[in-house]
Amino acid sequence: MENLNHCPLEDIKVNPWKTPQSTARVITLRVEDPNEINNLLSINEIDNPNYILQAIMLANAFQNALVPTSTDFGDALRFSMAKGLEIANTITPMGAVVSYVDQNVTQTNNQVSVMINKVLEVLKTVLGVALSGSVIDQLTAAVTNTFTNLNTQKNEAWIFWGKETANQTNYTYNVLFAIQNAQTGGVMYCVPVGFEIKVSAVKEQVLFFTIQDSASYNVNIQSLKFAQPLVSSSQYPIADLTSAINGTL
């Protein structure tokens, strides 16, 4: 499959987080308990920093949409599209779910880069008009990191390792994009994504996969795009601002 992305996979195969990131801010968020790490890797493309608190609040809200997975994954957590739709109806100020997806993507003994491109095509459909060049770069890096460079992330809060067999590794991976740019206009888009990944390889191999390696995959992708009118940080209660500063930034 041809790679149509602005940032070629070959340019980020070693460490995608070291590629140029425009105005994007990559932050790990904390939930109410300061000892608990948010299980969504939050990637924010915010043109106006006055709206960064809004991105944090949305990420914290959708943290509650992570649910236990199927039997093959043990106690692993994964963003649930169905639960996310429920959460979206409770968020204030009121927003709207613009699109959502629950889709399986598979491949048999093909390069990891092929699976990455398949997943990218699904998520580009969800993101839609918010796809400026820098957002495509961030999306490409995030999806690449979902399947490669796992040894550097194996103990991070956004990845959960499920049950293993002699020839299969199961894991979940959770990412959230918050986007406010010229394409989004007067709203912020929040796009949480949950992956259930079954790969026909032992964990020690999976941890060191590059985009040139080959493997068989069965991947379930659950995601939605939530649009909320822009909310200035000054409109949030001071307690929310203090909590964000102390527990997040």
From Swiss-Prot:
Any one annotated GO CC term: extracellular region
GO MF terms, alphabetically ordered: toxin activity
Pfam family, one: Bac_thur_toxin
GO annotation, biological process: sporulation resulting in formation of a cellular spore
Keyword Metal-binding: no
Keywords assigned by UniProt, alphabetized: Plasmid, Sporulation, Toxin, Virulence
Post-translational modification: Active after proteolytic processing.
Superkingdom to which the source organism belongs: Bacteria
N-terminal signal peptide: none
Family to which this protein belongs: Belongs to the cyt1/cyt2 endotoxin family.
Function: Kills the larvae of dipteran insects by making pores in the epithelial cell membrane of the insect midgut. Acts on mosquitos and black flies.
Protein name (database record): Type-1Aa cytolytic delta-endotoxin
